[in-house]
């Protein structure tokens, strides 16, 4: 009813400790089942990779490519690389690694601005 073309999923893959507490369970399976139940398969799911305002000590041994492969495996339609917190720009190397790992769309998320986009988008 909202007319949305996509949703952004913060906890699609892997656990994290966030400002709102422990996010122990990734939501990929639950979200995909709910999308199907609603008959909303046309609504794309964009997965946040390394949610902002979070500690990723639980997944510190995973590089950005591993996050991308997991999101692909769990059928994300696209991915978002964000800064570590609001107004902190995404890391250009992580953005480049994500894009080199997948053919799916990868967006620069939180922290990307018109002023810094040209710099962080450099491959």
What do these predicted ranges mean?
Residues 1-104, 108, 114-123:
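Alpha/beta enzyme core
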């Amino acid at each position: 009813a909202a007319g949305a073309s996509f949703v952004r999923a913060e906890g699609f893959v892997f656990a994290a400790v966030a400002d709102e507490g422990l996010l122990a369970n990734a939501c990929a399976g639950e979200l995909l089942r709910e999308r199907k139940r609603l008959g909303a398969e046309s609504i794309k799911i964009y997965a946040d990779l390394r949610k902002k305002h979070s500690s990723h000590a639980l997944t510190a041994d995973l590089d950005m490519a591993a996050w991308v492969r997991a999101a692909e495996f769990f059928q994300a339609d696209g991915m978002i690389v964000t800064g570590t917190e609001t107004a902190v720009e995404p890391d250009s190397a992580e953005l480049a690694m994500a894009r080199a790992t997948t053919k799916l769309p990868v967006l620069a998320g939180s922290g990307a601005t018109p002023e810094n986009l040209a710099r962080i988008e450099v491959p």
